[in-house]
């Protein structure tokens, strides 16, 4: 009958236990943030390519893009949230736009919400042509983001398992 002998089995079990305890904080978190950084950088690059238009759009003649101040505000407020666990037990970060720009009006006394401006650019409106910068960026770098996440996760696992 064949037998199997494990040498240093207890040491290996301790490493696996430590990996289990530290997996979320030291492996998953950095890996998810590395992937999100790749995507956020791609969104920023695509946003810089969006044309600006200082005119007023109509349904017959929509503007081709946002005003320069709107675009600058979006570039300045693009960010990544901290990692959170959702109801299904999945860990996520969100990439998005925060705050308000400097274009004030009766409707927006604080300034226009940057999330609203980004959505208007991405989807278009009756007075602005759509410029798909988020969807385009995400589809272009999806594989790169996954590769960055895998590389970071493997590196962190190797550090813990040493």
Task: Please place each PLM-identified region on the residue numbering.
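Short, low-complexity, charged/polar segments at coil/turn and helix-coil boundaries
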Residues: 25-123, 155, 161-162
């Amino acid at each position: 009958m064949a037998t199997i002998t494990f040498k240093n089995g207890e040491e290996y079990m301790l490493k696996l236990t430590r990996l289990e305890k530290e997996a979320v904080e030291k492996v998953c978190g950095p890996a998810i943030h590395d992937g999100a950084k790749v995507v956020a950088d791609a969104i920023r690059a695509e946003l810089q390519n969006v044309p600006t238009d200082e005119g007023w759009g109509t349904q017959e003649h929509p503007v081709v893009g946002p005003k320069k101040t709107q675009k600058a505000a979006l570039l300045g407020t693009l960010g990544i949230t901290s990692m959170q666990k959702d109801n299904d037990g999945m860990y996520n970060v969100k990439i998005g736009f925060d705050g308000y720009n400097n274009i004030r009006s009766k409707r927006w006394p604080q300034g226009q919400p940057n999330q609203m401006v980004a959505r208007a650019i991405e989807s278009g409106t009756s007075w602005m042509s759509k410029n798909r910068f988020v969807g385009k960026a995400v589809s272009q770098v999806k594989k790169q983001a996954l590769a960055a996440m895998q590389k970071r996760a493997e590196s962190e696992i190797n550090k813990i398992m040493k």
